[in-house]
Each structure stands twice: as C-alpha cells, then as structure tokens.
C-alpha cells in the first residue's frame, strides 16, 4: 500500500520491538518507511486521532488479552485474528477472542472481525484437513468469529521479506513470490482494502 502512495500508519501497542525492528530494516534497505506510533493502555483516543490523518491504520496489539486489545476493539473497523489451524493451542484461543469481540461489538457494532488462517503447509494433508475442519466448525455457528476465504500458506518468502523489512510486494524475485503476492491481494480484496 505504501508503494501505491497510500498513507499508512502503524500503531504499536505491543511492548515487543518487532515492528520497530522491521521498520528500521525497511529504512536500511532503501524501502519507503512506514510511520510507527507507540501507545499503551487505553488506545481508543489515539486510534480515533490517527484514523483522521491516514488512509490505512494498522494496529499491532499484543497476542494476548490486554487493555490495548480491548480498547482497540471499541473503535477499530476490522479485526484480523491470525490462527494456524494445525495448532490446537492457537485454535483454542478463538473462544476467548470471540468473547472479547462480541463484548466490544456492543459498543462498536460496525467492527468486522475475521479469522485469518495462516502458515498452512499445503503439502501436508494434516494441515489441509485442520484448515478444512476448523473452517467448518466456525461456519456452523455464527456466534464464532467467521473465517475469511483467503488463506495464507507457509511460504518462505513471507519470512524472508519480513526479515528484510519488506512485504512480498517489495520483493522482485523469489520462490513462490507470485503465490504469496496473490494471497495478499486476495486478502486485501476480501477485506475491501485496495492495496
């Protein structure tokens, strides 16, 4: 999106430094930097302010229940919760996440929550079956956060790009690059975001 002249801001609400490290690598590799803001605690007012000055605001919340996560849900437009379907531990977190989302939707009824299946190794039948089974389970009951149709494969290019501070659309040549780009483009399209 940054490469297409979209104004993008990242709000870092997680205390680890992954996003800052990623953005520093972007700069070192001559890629367009993405403004990163940091805020902790109740982040709802900062989100409202930042939404006014950019086209796309990405909020990086901790991967566990937190004040940051709960307050972000009250003002966010879209929630993506990433789950590796073959990991029982990750799939089991959906009960708790769904509860938090449904509570937040009482305040923010426009919130669109989605489950994104990630790191699916399509060469392993067990991984494919786990994705199919979890998809079916979630779709059987609308109380669950619903899964997106788009799925992200376990491709080395995603990690390699990230390690360079890039996204797959910043990369010129790599194995499985066209597949990775297509998956990201399908995700953006499904979410109604023009990359």
Where in this protein do the model-derived segments appear?
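Beta-strand-loop-alpha "switch" segments that mediate conformational coupling across diverse proteins
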Residues: 121, 132-169
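Inter-lobe coupling/hinge region of RecA-like P-loop helicase motors
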Residues: 159-181, 185
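Inter-motif core of Ras-like GTPase G domains
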Residues: 66-87
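Conserved C-terminal guanine-recognition region of P-loop GTPase G domains, centered on the G4
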Residues: 91-110
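C-terminal alpha-helix
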Residues: 183-195
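Structural beta-sheet core signal
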Residues: 9-10, 59, 81, 115-117
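P-loop/Walker-type NTP enzyme "switch/lid" segment
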Residues: 1-63, 67, 162-163
């Amino acid at each position: 999106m940054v490469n297409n002249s979209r104004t993008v801001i990242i709000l870092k609400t997680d205390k680890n430094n992954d996003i800052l490290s990623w953005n520093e690598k972007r700069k070192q590799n001559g890629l367009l930097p993405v403004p990163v803001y940091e805020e902790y605690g109740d982040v709802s007012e900062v989100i409202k302010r930042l939404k006014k000055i950019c086209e796309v605001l990405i909020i990086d919340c901790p991967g566990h229940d937190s004040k940051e996560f709960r307050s972000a849900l009250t003002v966010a437009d879209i929630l993506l919760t990433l789950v590796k379907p073959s990991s029982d531990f990750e799939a089991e977190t959906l009960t708790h996440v769904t509860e938090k989302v449904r509570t937040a939707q009482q305040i923010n009824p426009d919130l669109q929550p989605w489950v994104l299946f990630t790191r699916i190794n399509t060469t392993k039948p067990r991984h494919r079956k786990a994705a199919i089974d979890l998809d079916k389970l979630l779709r059987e009951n609308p109380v669950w956060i619903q899964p997106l149709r788009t799925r992200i494969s376990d491709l080395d290019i995603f990690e390699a790009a990230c390690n360079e501070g890039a996204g797959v659309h910043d990369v010129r040549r790599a194995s499985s690059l066209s597949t990775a780009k297509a998956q990201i483009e399908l995700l953006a399209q499904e979410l109604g975001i023009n990359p």
